[in-house]
């Protein structure tokens, strides 16, 4: 077992001007970037994950393993159960200025989801956001485009 207080390297003021290039400033089990191999999620090259179902990619990021068929089906079913968006979110989005940038709308949508469905559990809140974002994004698009009232999602499709 390694000593948690062991000094691994020394950073000098001159290193700060390079953006700490070459010095690890944190570790993460979820993703890594290698200058030669590129971006990896949980050890998988990102190109190998490009054709996954979105739910399979979300499962990988949450649980650090690719789901088998049964796990993926159960995960999709769980997201469907959680997919209902509080009407307060949609009504508040409808009141936003149309001139706002789409990313500002997305930030507002995420904030509204957090304010209307907080459970106190990081995992539960994350699953709720994943399940509800498709409807929020679709509502933002309809509202900003002037296509009328947002249409309730059909997550089972």
Identify the role of each PLM range.
Residues 1-157:
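Hydrophobic alpha-helical bundle cores within soluble ligand-binding/oligomerization subdomains
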């Amino acid at each position: 077992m390694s000593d948690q207080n062991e000094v691994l390297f020394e950073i000098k003021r001159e290193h700060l001007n390079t953006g700490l290039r070459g010095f690890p400033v944190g570790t993460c089990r979820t993703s890594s970037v290698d200058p030669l191999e590129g971006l990896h999620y949980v050890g998988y090259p990102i190109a190998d994950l490009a054709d996954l179902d979105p739910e399979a990619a979300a499962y990988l990021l949450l649980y650090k393993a690719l789901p088998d068929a049964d796990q993926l089906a159960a995960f999709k079913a769980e997201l469907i159960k959680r997919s209902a968006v509080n009407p307060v979110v949609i009504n508040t989005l409808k009141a936003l200025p149309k001139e706002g940038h789409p990313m500002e709308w997305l930030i507002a949508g995420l904030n509204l989801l957090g304010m209307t469905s907080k459970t106190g559990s990081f995992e539960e809140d994350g699953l709720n956001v994943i399940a509800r974002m498709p409807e929020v994004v679709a509502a933002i698009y309809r509202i900003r485009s002037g296509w009328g009232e947002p249409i309730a999602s059909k997550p089972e499709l």
